[in-house]
């Protein structure tokens, strides 16, 4: 592929509208400074002091992040999160991204937001080292009423997108 052909293709990304249907989660990174390690008075176990916390959309949100990086014009996540602090944080991070429309991203009190907490040992001039991950998941099936809302939402989005350039990723 020539550079001109590549630019010709990628220059059209801004005109696309893409829906992403899938499991969105919150990836939360806890950056730990090993120089600040202490010992717990109560338990005698090591205490890993977190010096920075950052979060970003994960799961299907990783695909969304990639589309944002490619400067796709409009991106519509079709999914849900819990009505909890992690859901608030996930929605906030999605809303910060250019071109992301949250009209079809449902908040539900019946579910908790999938959250993957990733402790990282961070030292100067070294790659971060990930410790054991801490996951918060739903261990029961998605309630049928909530599951039924998502296909209806995606169908409404497809009908309202008639005649527009773009694809629905399912």
Regions found by a protein language model. Name each.
Residues 1-38, 42, 49-170:
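Ribokinase/PfkB-type carbohydrate-kinase core domain
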């Amino acid at each position: 592929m020539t550079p001109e052909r590549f630019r010709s293709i990628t220059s059209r990304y801004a005109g696309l509208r893409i829906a992403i249907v899938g499991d969105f989660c919150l990836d939360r990174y806890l950056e730990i400074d090993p120089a600040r390690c202490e010992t717990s008075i109560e338990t005698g176990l090591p205490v890993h002091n977190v010096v920075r916390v950052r979060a970003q959309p994960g799961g299907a949100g990783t695909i969304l992040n990639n589309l944002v990086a490619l400067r796709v014009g409009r991106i519509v996540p079709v999914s849900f999160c819990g009505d909890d602090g992690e859901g608030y944080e996930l929605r906030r991070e999605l809303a910060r991204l250019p071109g992301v429309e949250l009209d079809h991203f449902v908040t539900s009190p019946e579910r908790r937001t999938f959250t993957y907490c990733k402790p990282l040992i961070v030292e100067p001039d070294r790659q971060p080292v990930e410790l054991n991950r801490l996951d918060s998941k739903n261990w029961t099936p998605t309630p049928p009423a909530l599951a039924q809302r998502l296909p209806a939402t995606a169908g409404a989005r497809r009908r309202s997108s008639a005649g527009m350039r773009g694809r629905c990723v399912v």
